[in-house]
Amino acid sequence: QTSKIEDEANELTDYLRDSLHCDVVTVELMHNTEKYIGGYHKRFYDESFPSVNTAEGVQFNCKDYQCIPTNLFPIIGYMLKNKFEWFPSMKEITKIDAGYAKILKDYKCIALGMRAMKTSKGEDLGILTVSWREGHSDRIPELSVIQEKMTEIASKLEVLLDMSDYD
C-alpha cells in the first residue's frame, strides 16, 4: 500500500530518470521532516523514500545504499549550502566525503548530480540526486539539461513533500 504522495513522487523520479537517462534517482529527506511526515506516513523516513529508483523499478530499503540517516554524511551538509552541484568524477566527492564516495564507488557510479530542496519556509527539506554507472558515460546529457531537469523535478518535490505548514 503506497500513499498518493509516494505515488506522485515515484512518477516524478521515474520521469527524471527517463529524461536524463541516468541509472539511479534518490530522494533523501532530512531528519527534521520526520516530525511532519512520520506521523501519517512512516515509510517516508524509515525507507529513505524512495530509497533507490532504478530502471528495474523502485527498490525500497536498499540498506547498503542510502538508508543510513543521510544527514550524517558531510556531503549532505555541504550540498544544502549549494543549490546544485555536479560531480563528473568520484575524486571531487572523496575530497568532501570519503564515506559517501566509497558507497558510490561500490555501486560503480561514475557521475553524480545533486540538488538541495527547501521547504516554503526556507528550511532544509532534503537532497535530490541522480547518478550514472560505469559504462553509461555516453548517456550523460549536457550539464545545462541536467540542471534544468533536476530543478524542474526538485521544485515539484518541494511542493509535494513540504509538510512545514502542518505544525
List each language-model region with its residue ranges:
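Well-ordered, non-membrane alpha-helical segments in soluble/globular domains
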Residues: 6-12, 70-73, 144-153
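Intrinsically disordered, low-complexity terminal regulatory regions
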Residues: 1-53, 163
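Short, solvent-exposed, Trp/other aromatic-anchored flexible loops in extracytoplasmic proteins
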Residues: 103-109, 129
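Short hydrophobic beta-strand micro-motif common in sensory/regulatory domains
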Residues: 110-118
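Juxtadomain coupling helices with adjacent low-complexity linkers
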Residues: 124-167
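Flexible loop/coil segments at beta-strand boundaries within sensory signal-transduction domains
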Residues: 118-124
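Regulatory sensory and allosteric helical modules in signal-transduction proteins
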Residues: 48-105
